Amino acid sequence: MSDHPGPGAVTPELFGVGGDWLAVTAGESGASVFRAADATRYAKCVPAADAAGLEAERDRIAWLSGQGVPGPRVLDWYAGDAGACLVTRAVPGVPADRVGADDLRTAWGAVADAVRRLHEVPVASCPFRRGLDSVVDAARDVVARGAVHPEFLPVEQRLVPPAELLARLTGELARRRDQEAADTVVCHGDLCLPNIVLHPETLEVSGFIDLGRLGAADRHADLALLLANARETWVDEERARFADAAFAERYGIAPDPERLRFYLHLDPLTWG
């Protein structure tokens, strides 16, 4: 290993995975991510308690790679008493949050095209569900454990008790369920700029990464995260609104602002 993860981290070496690996991140969930020295592979390792979640991510990557949507491919899978390790082919390029506003504006049409292709995958063929009720159940669990990350919340909500934030949203569930039933697509589940990889020269989309939350859901669950996250790159609100309009035109559907708001406020309550 050319770099070292934190103490107690599960590493590729524990599973006999060959090669020289560099530690990239260690997530709060206990997951550790490593990049091969030649940048062709990634390894994600978790302790045994989190192996089922990583196995679910493996299955989603394997399924999506057969749907004509660019992304990683599963190369190896290891599981044992120490935990589990998923090795995938790297998606070449640079995450879209690491390019400036000018480059993101150039890439924006390609991003809209790629998201549309993902959402056009026949939803009946998708074996994974990320329905609204299951997402709300996850939020209830996170809130009950007091595990909501305040920094994930909009600034204006950070002093509001998470239970109150969730109660505001659950009052809308009947309407949102009906909308989901009428507009379910294959969603990425965490469609923010770091999970969209761009070719550094052409600025075309090389692929989607971090697919652990992929599943059938209301398309607005994806669009809310993407459009809000892109606002961190656009230099002002006028350009952000122009980008939103350009995305809608290229994507082919004008998003519903109220559904965008709902999913944008629900998502931060599901991480913890």
Swiss-Prot record:
Catalyzed chemical reaction(s): streptomycin + ATP = streptomycin 3''-phosphate + ADP + H(+)
Enzyme Commission designation: 2.7.1.87
Xref: Gene3D superfamilies: 3.90.1200.10, Phosphorylase Kinase, domain 1
Active site, per annotation: 190 (proton acceptor)
GO BP of this protein: response to antibiotic
Keyword annotations from UniProtKB, A to Z: Antibiotic resistance, ATP-binding, Kinase, Nucleotide-binding, Transferase
The keyword Nucleotide-binding is assigned to this record: yes
Single GO MF annotation: ATP binding
One of the Pfam families matching this protein, by short name: APH
NCBIfam families assigned to the protein according to its UniProt record, in alphabetical order: APH_3pp (NF032896), APH_3pp_Ia (NF032894)
Function: The aminoglycoside phosphotransferases achieve inactivation of their antibiotic substrates by phosphorylation.
Family to which the UniProt record says this protein belongs: Belongs to the aminoglycoside phosphotransferase family.
Designated name of the protein: Streptomycin 3''-kinase
Species in which this protein is naturally found: Streptomyces griseus
Gene: aphE
